[in-house]
Amino acid sequence: MRADRPGHRSRGINPGPGMFTLVGPDERDDPEVAVDPIRRVAMISLHTSPLDQPGTGDAGGMNVYVIELSKRLAAQGIAVDIFTRATTSAVEPLVEAYDGVQVRHIHAGPFEGLTKAELPGQLCVFAREVLRAEAAQPVGHYDVVHSHYWLSGQVGALARDRWGVPLVHSMHTMAKVKNDALAEGDTPEPAARIIGEEQVVEAADMLVANTDIEAKQLVNMYDADPSRVEVVHPGVDLGVFRPQDRSTARARLGLPEDAAVLLFAGRIQPLKAPDVLLRAVAELLAQTPELRSRLVVPIVGGPSGSGLEHPESLAQLASELGLDGAGGTGPVVRFVPPVSQEELARWCAAATLVAVPSYNESFGLVAAEAQATGTPVVAAAVGGLTTVVRDGRSGLLVDTHDPRDWADALRRVVENDAFRDRLAAGALEQARLFSWEHTARQTLDVYRRARAEIREAV
């Protein structure tokens, strides 16, 4: 790492007021001293709490990532403090989420009414409160800052310079990538976000990418230094997402034993493309009308932001496509509010397949979780989904978002039990590649490397 890289202040050299050196003078003079162990990590997840229900508001895969990584780090003896913005007065300022994992709810702006697009106006207040929380602790309280999403990265960069510790950053999503793959009618990410992301990429000591594809995007689209980018795959809680008896799962969920269940699970937003699935189902039924009597399409999740239980536009589309049962044939589409991880695992196990038609995914956690239950995935051949799903082995990848192509892929799985069984076996095999324990070990290696390179820089 170059200590003189713009935006990176050398450690242990002329610290400003209130800063402390990561390495004391005596230690710097002793080449035998090894890098101190990582004892405590400050996780920053400004815009969404890891305690929120995934599938609601802005809560999704990132929430699962932050809390699961934190739990696994704590299991290795590393204390984790997660800083997030309070969105209700009902939560305590400090919550002991798990042994070794604390969630600190920071008051920054009103509890309700702020959209994610309005949160940059609260960065200053949020950052101030994070710095105050650290200032109340002994000097050197945190060894690493790990920020998630660009808003958190802005705060993390300030904490990095103030505390004299390395900043590790995970993008999770990137504006330039999203804008290159916009759904029809979706709103482009603003220039302010792009600028903010570029600043975070420049400020971070290490960048964690979910896949090789994301790593290349960081280098090619954001001019990230390749030597500062490490690929660490997210994991799956294999204790929760595991094979279950399908008949039992269906009985618990009120699904017919002989149903063809095409599950969509996630936030209902243009990027996730649930409309593509509905149009594909309509195409499938037009070509194979005899499927209607046993076809069930659960849409499990809620819209981004506050929203309704199911957005009117998607419900209207289901009606227009004749999938709502208004004609007396019974509803094909069922809207299901967001569910717990345990309940989601049951839905995945009950499904014939899980559909992930997103226009982009940095990883595609729900696809990995579905495979861990032994359920094949039909996914768009975009972003991290091409890493998670092995085409023809654990599921099918669809190169387009054309409903006809999607209908063909759905039909291949629904109508061929032997093929589906082969995919199910491959899904279980593929799922073994992803565990949160492995993610935590690799992430800890990134933390250690960031600390070691800061020592070299000073």
From Swiss-Prot:
Protein name from the UniProt record: D-inositol 3-phosphate glycosyltransferase
MF terms (GO), sorted A to Z: acetylglucosaminyltransferase activity; D-inositol-3-phosphate glycosyltransferase activity; magnesium ion binding
Gene: mshA
Annotated UDP-N-acetyl-alpha-D-glucosamine binding sites: 53-54, 61, 267, 272, 339, 361, 369
Ranges for region Disordered: 1-29
UniProt superkingdom: Bacteria
PANTHER family xref list: SULFOQUINOVOSYL TRANSFERASE SQD2
Chain residues that bind 1D-myo-inositol 3-phosphate: 47, 58-63, 116, 149, 173, 193
